[in-house]
């Protein structure tokens, strides 16, 4: 086993919290150099390279100590020293020990890497697929060309649609190849197979017209074109020598400035409050503009839009459109990015596209079976679908991997209220407040509502005072108004009605049903309930489980 080289020649940097680890062996904290011995440096690099995955003790011993005669005690001492170098304490754990498995770096890490030299270019012509529906053929042709054009920085040059769109006969193909001389071309034929389709793909090297690969791909009904594009991209990697897009590289940010903006945006996203999500939206949008070829900001931005919709502070329909756009962009940069696939899985299942969503979640989990992100998205998906027991189990798995994830803790609190009742919810809320969510206004507003439902009005009023007025919007406002109704009954109704009148698109927000029921009565609430049910409203599935709406079921 070769020795780990502690000073590789690279301009890559790892950034976490206020640390910067350079690949020249130096560690900086707030721009001041921190002494780190070679062995500790080597272990830290391996943990950071693993990007949150578990690294076994044997792997660390083999790569850092090589063939030297050492035992696990040497590694234990090294980890202990590394924790001291990083000033680790109980509140800020950087390195997690998983007994019997190994170690894992437990904090957000961003890799900064300057752009790599441009690779050799391979020109590709994508011919229109033979299909019964001409309009559908043109649409699919455009989508595939657009999708594969994203790989231009990695050596793939795709001829534009305007040149290839009329290339359908053998004569047209031969003329195009003779005039423009691309290196390769792709042709395809779509054959109906029940409700689905079989796409027969051929990849041909133009020199000698040599067939490199032939494959049949099954397309499920309503499956997005980006998934077919991803499969074709994988085939190109296998068939074209020298064509390599490093998916790890395109997930990295290209400057310290963009890294710092991303980390600030990610921090605000993780705080999971109305104000912090609005700040995250600004920062992550800025980061996408600074690093348009990096995956992480697109994924974070997609999650931000979904979170704002869930919290009732962004128009739900527009949020879903924006989230899907950014998740698709991330998959165009790396078709095997687990977080992006998980986000698309969540978005598709929210839209009742269960088969596609299930396939995406399955692929994401296979690529990254121990991911707090994937566990959270899947648990959120199960919660929205009403599978409360399975949702609770999955969210618990997420919190085991990342106990500080505010959004997962709050999702668990809603699930507990729906599944096992208000007493368990109050106990869990107190537990979460004593751990990582003591000041979170969403959690506080939920506790105020739960306590008010139980008749503990004085305690609820005391807790209300801890919520900042700038955070009282969306779901927080709804929770506090419902608590006010529990405390003051009829006297609270004018305020609730005024709030409902001020809300835009009330007919598209099932989260307002508890207030509508108490303010306007069962008949109007039932009318809204049936409207959401008949429209198959994507957010109704989540709210119809609320115990406060039991009269309407």
From Swiss-Prot:
Disruption phenotype: Abnormal expression of genes encoding virulence proteins. Does not affect the production of reactive oxygen species (ROS) in infected pigs. InterPro entries: OmpR/PhoB-type_DNA-bd, Sig_transdc_resp-reg_C-effctor, TPR-like_helical_dom_sf, TPR_rpt, WH-like_DNA-bd_sf. It comes from Salmonella typhimurium (strain LT2 / SGSC1412 / ATCC 700720). Keywords: Activator, DNA-binding, Phosphoprotein, TPR repeat, Transcription, Transcription regulation, Two-component regulatory system, Virulence. It comes from the Bacteria. The main transcriptional regulator of the Salmonella pathogenicity island 1 (SPI1) gene expression. Activates the expression of invasion genes by a direct action at their promoters and also indirectly by increasing the level of InvF. Also binds upstream of prgH and directly activates the expression of prgHIJK operon. Induction: Expressed in response to both environmental conditions and genetic regulatory factors. Transcription is subject to complex control and is stimulated by the SPI1-encoded HilC and HilD. Pfam families: Trans_reg_C. This is Transcriptional regulator HilA. Residues 11-107 bind DNA. PROSITE patterns: OMPR_PHOB (PS51755), TPR (PS50005), TPR_REGION (PS50293). GO terms for molecular function: phosphorelay response regulator activity; transcription cis-regulatory region binding. GO terms for cellular component: cytosol; protein-DNA complex. One of its GO terms (biological process) is regulation of DNA-templated transcription. TPR repeats lie at residues 372-405. The modification 4-aspartylphosphate is found at residue 62.
């Amino acid at each position: 086993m070769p020795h780990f080289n502690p000073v590789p020649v690279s301009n890559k940097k790892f950034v976490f919290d206020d640390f910067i680890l350079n690949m020249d062996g130096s560690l900086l904290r707030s721009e001041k150099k921190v002494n780190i011995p070679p062995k500790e440096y080597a272990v830290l690099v391996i943990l950071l390279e693993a990007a949150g995955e578990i690294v076994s003790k044997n792997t660390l011993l083999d790569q850092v100590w090589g063939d030297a005669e050492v035992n696990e005690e040497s590694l234990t001492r090294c980890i202990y020293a590394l924790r001291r170098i990083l000033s680790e304490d109980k509140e800020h754990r950087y390195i997690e020990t998983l007994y019997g498995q190994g170690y894992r770096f437990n904090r957000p890490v961003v890799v900064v890497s300057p752009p790599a030299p441009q690779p050799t270019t391979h020109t590709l012509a994508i011919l229109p697929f033979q299909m019964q529906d001409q309009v559908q053929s043109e649409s699919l042709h455009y989508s595939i060309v657009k999708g594969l054009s994203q790989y231009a920085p990695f050596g793939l040059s795709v001829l534009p649609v305007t040149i290839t769109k009329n290339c359908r006969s053998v004569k047209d193909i031969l003329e195009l190849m003779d005039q423009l001389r691309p290196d390769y071309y792709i042709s395809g034929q779509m054959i109906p197979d029940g409700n689905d389709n079989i796409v027969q793909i051929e990849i041909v090297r133009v020199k000698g017209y040599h067939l490199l690969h032939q494959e049949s791909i099954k397309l499920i009904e309503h499956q997005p074109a980006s998934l077919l594009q991803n499969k074709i991209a994988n085939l190109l990697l296998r068939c074209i020598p020298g064509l390599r897009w490093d998916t790890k590289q395109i997930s990295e940010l290209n400057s310290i400035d963009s890294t710092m903006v991303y980390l600030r945006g990610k921090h605000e996203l993780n705080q999971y409050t109305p104000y912090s999500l609005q700040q995250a939206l600004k920062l992550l949008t800025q980061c996408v503009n600074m690093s348009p070829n990096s995956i992480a900001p697109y994924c974070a931005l997609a999650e931000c839009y979904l979170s704002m919709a869930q919290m009732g502070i962004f128009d739900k329909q527009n949020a879903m459109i924006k989230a899907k756009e950014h998740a698709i962009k991330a998959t165009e940069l790396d078709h095997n990015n687990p977080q992006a696939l998980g986000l698309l899985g969540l978005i598709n299942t929210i839209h009742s596209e269960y088969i596609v969503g299930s396939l995406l979640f399955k692929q994401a989990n296979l690529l990254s079976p121990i991911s707090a992100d994937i566990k959270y998205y899947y648990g959120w998906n199960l919660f929205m679908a009403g599978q409360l027991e399975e949702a609770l189990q999955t969210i618990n798995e997420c919190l085991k991997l990342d106990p500080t994830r505010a959004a997962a803790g709050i999702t668990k609190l809603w699930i507990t209220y729906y599944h096992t009742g208000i007493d368990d919810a109050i106990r869990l809320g107190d537990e979460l407040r004593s751990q990582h969510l003591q000041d979170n206004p969403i959690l506080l507003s939920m506790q105020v509502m739960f306590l008010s439902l139980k008749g503990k009005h004085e305690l609820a009023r005391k807790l209300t005072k801890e919520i900042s007025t700038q955070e009282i919007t969306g779901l927080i406002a709804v929770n506090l108004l419902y608590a006010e109704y529990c405390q003051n009954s009829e006297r609270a109704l004018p305020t609730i009605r005024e709030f409902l009148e001020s809300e835009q698109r009330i007919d598209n927000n099932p989260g307002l049903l508890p207030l509508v029921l108490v303010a306007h009565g069962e008949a109007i609430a039932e009318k809204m309930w049936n409207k959401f049910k008949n429209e198959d409203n994507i957010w109704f599935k989540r709210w119809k489980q609320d115990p406060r709406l039991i009269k309407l079921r």
